[in-house]
Amino acid sequence: EVLSFIEESVQGDLAFFDNSEGELIHVGIMLEDHHIIHAYGKVRIDSIDHTGIFNREEKRYTHQLRMIKKMV
């Protein structure tokens, strides 16, 4: 089931990210409190919102959110 809003996600749901051509290029596992665990050079826990993954160290979005699928 594809979720309409990030607020509907729970820990364990999968978030998918695309590039500017619309190709899926990245996936992560949703955690609590709008965080995600994913591998981007190394395994990371970052913030996520309706735009995508925000890297606080780089102060920029690194991945554009395409959809979140309910897994649990």
Regions found by a protein language model. Give the residues of each.
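Structural motif
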Residues: G12-L14, H34
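Catalytic nucleophile-His microenvironment captured as a short glycine-rich beta-strand/loop
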Residues: L24-E32
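Short gly/pro-enriched beta-turn/loop segments at secondary-structure junctions
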Residues: S9-V10, E23
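Catalytic cysteine-centered active-site loop
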Residues: E1-S9
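Short beta-strand or tight-loop elements
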Residues: V10-Q11, Q64
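A generic structural signal for residues embedded in beta-strands
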Residues: F16-F17, H38
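Aromatic- and glycine-rich peptidoglycan recognition patches
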Residues: L3, L31-V72
